[in-house]
């Protein structure tokens, strides 16, 4: 009688482990990665919103796609798809009075974190909203996304 329960318990445990059921350590790792992503996005936003940025009005003319719904880590696929355009806009805006240090490194860091968080198996097709967003709106929405996910993990 107990043997069947033990075998069921072992089978369930193996199923959970193989399906990468979240553990407290993986939750903590996810939270740390989200915090790093949040800081990188905030650093870019702060650089853009710097009062000395003469190219802000030009940067606001570029539009970015936002997902209709971004509530899960797998939705980071949509952020990943917009990283190249983001990098291009940031590079266009570089000047003597406005310079984001290591734009390429920041975008690379964001890309690495996003890939780790969403997982390599994600084949989500992003459903984008009808309206596009400015660079400031884009960054603010992804910052809010990170904060929202972090709050659910704590």
Swiss-Prot record:
GO terms for biological process: adaptive immune response. It is found in: Secreted. Gene3D superfamilies: 1.20.1250.10. Disulfide bonds join 78-126. The keyword Repeat does not apply. This is Interleukin-2. Cytokine produced by activated CD4-positive helper T-cells and to a lesser extend activated CD8-positive T-cells and natural killer (NK) cells that plays pivotal roles in the immune response and tolerance. Binds to a receptor complex composed of either the high-affinity trimeric IL-2R (IL2RA/CD25, IL2RB/CD122 and IL2RG/CD132) or the low-affinity dimeric IL-2R (IL2RB and IL2RG). Interaction with the receptor leads to oligomerization and conformation changes in the IL-2R subunits resulting in downstream signaling starting with phosphorylation of JAK1 and JAK3. One of its GO terms (cellular component) is extracellular space. GO terms for molecular function: cytokine activity; growth factor activity; interleukin-2 receptor binding. Keywords: Adaptive immunity, Cytokine, Disulfide bond, Glycoprotein, Growth factor, Immunity, Secreted, Signal. The keyword Nucleus does not apply. The gene is IL2.
